[in-house]
Amino acid sequence: MSKHTHSFQAEVAQLLHLVTHSLYSNKEIFLRELVSNASDACDKLRFEALNNAALYEDAPNLEVRVSFDKEARTLTITDNGIGMSEQEAIDHLGTIAKSGTRDFMNRLSGDQKADAQLIGQFGVGFYSGFIVADRITVESRRAGLPASEGVRWASGGAGDFEVEAIERAARGTSVILHLREDAEEFLNAWKIKQVIGKYSDHISLPILMEKEEWKESEKEGEPGQMVKTGEWETVNKASALWTRPKKDITDEQYQDFYKSISHDFENPLTWSHNRVEGNTEYTQLLYIPAKAPFDLWNRDKKAGVKLYVKRVFIMDDAESLMPSYLRFVKGVIDSADLPLNVSRELLQESRDVRLIRDGSVKRVLSMLEDLAKHDKHEAAAEGADGVQDVVSAEDKAKEGKYTQFYAEFGAVLKEGLGEDFANRERLAKLLRFASTTSDTPSVSFADYKARMKEGQEAIYYITADTLAAAKNSPQLEVFKKKGIEVLLMTDRVDEWALNYLQDFDGTPLQSVAKGAVDLGKLQDEAEKKAAEEAAEAFKPMLAKLKEALKDKAEDVRVTTRLVDSPACLVVQDGGMSTQLARLLKQAGQSAPDAKPVLEVNPEHALVKKLDGSVHFHDLAHILFDQALLAEGGLPEDPAAYVKRVNALLA
């Protein structure tokens, strides 16, 4: 039968080189990846066979076999799962089914642990075999196809691969690794069992290896050796981890299971394992990762929760079980009530699925609330009676974890304000921000309320592109002068999210960059009277400024928020900030073409200089453009701005 040579997808050869060399010291992960792939292939067969039992042929017992041949220097991982046709072998093994190939290569850092984590995230687990092999041969036959339609795929990991049709009686796939000289350890049964026990013990299918026994040499003086008996034995527990009692599962086993389903190299931040009984019965094992994946901001990415029904795998991207803002959650949900032939359409419509989703969201939020509660826990808090509280080791281990979580996933969590009305109040309590009293995002709305000045009627905040821009915004000047704390919000999602949160625990949220500032009881009568008098005296100048800036500003008015700066830009109450409008335009989306309001400080020297100046028109435009620059924007015509400034400096 003729062989056909194909070239790898562009960049794959380079990627193989990087994978091989950047992960060399973590080479045992290849076995984790290949066993996981074999298990997935069996899961897929089981799912397809729900509607076509003939796919089982004469082998209904699904399993993974691992064998080695010292003479040939090969290690083989075989499954009797769904298998591949010739075209599927070309499609699945000759290309990387991710648009992020270049991202993968760019993110390889030389840090062995971090790079190992990327392997599974980018869907390149199969290629990790080249860490230990200088050639890989794959033989496969798809379930349901005749034996004559088997396929052999082979590559040395360079620029191309060969494919040929073969006779293959057995359904499923064999991955044959031709080991490098320095991968001798993987021709040792003890080593292979150790790696399987470490990474794949939880796999619900049996993983089989040939039994070995010690045999003395028949020749005097020669050492004995381990020989294969021809019998096969199961070398893993072969039971789904989530079905076992919690008391029988160690933290290490929970962590290893997480690494297997998430392809993450790091331990999770926390997890929750529960059996829920009631109107609908299901088991959930949910994890919160310690690090954000590379594609966290891809809202179309598959959800990280696998769905099982009565321990039968159904799908691994069950987005109906977890909302988009919790797309970082990994884990397993096993339902006792859903039909085995559940479709995606049924998932979206099922009452049971809605109950499972609601329960799972509440479980995740409870995990986060628990971490947040212990984040600031004093290891030895002194009580009112002078006796130090004893902090448990479990509580001590949670300290600092919410800060770690929020640094990775806080911005995504904010999306929930607009997506999950039922849990909006719980989500609001979990949010953290920087403020004028703290550069780190550690201030909750509750913290802010507890520090509000007497007579303060609102929670004040400002949105900006960067922390520096927020901290130095002219719009904060009157708040700094009066010692009023302002929350500093610098995530792109902030302003959008806060459209869905008008108040916190009855206290309204107020942007310092929207509408007129009314400090209410925090402003004494003398200040109010002086501001009114200044506005009245400045009316003629305001009229001239409005006329000069009629194409740029919706209005010009005397400020109540500036102390040291000559001017600032604000928008009307309920309007879109100039920052959000810029972000939308940068993303190629339409934004309302609303003009901002220019507020001027009549006490500033530059503003006073306007009166009677022959350069009034130029100064007015400079005033506007500088206010725009101060909030992170750019003048509409930078060249004209520079020309005006130069003319005044000359």
UniProtKB/Swiss-Prot annotation:
Gene Ontology cellular component terms for the protein in this record: cytoplasm
Predominant cellular place of this UniProt entry's protein: cytoplasm
Cytoplasm as UniProt keyword: yes
Keyword ATP-binding: yes
Keyword tags: ATP-binding, Chaperone, Cytoplasm, Nucleotide-binding, Stress response
Family listed: Belongs to the heat shock protein 90 family.
Known role: Molecular chaperone. Has ATPase activity.
Subunit organization: Homodimer.
This protein's name: Chaperone protein HtpG
Organism the protein comes from: Acidovorax sp. (strain JS42)
Annotated gene: htpG
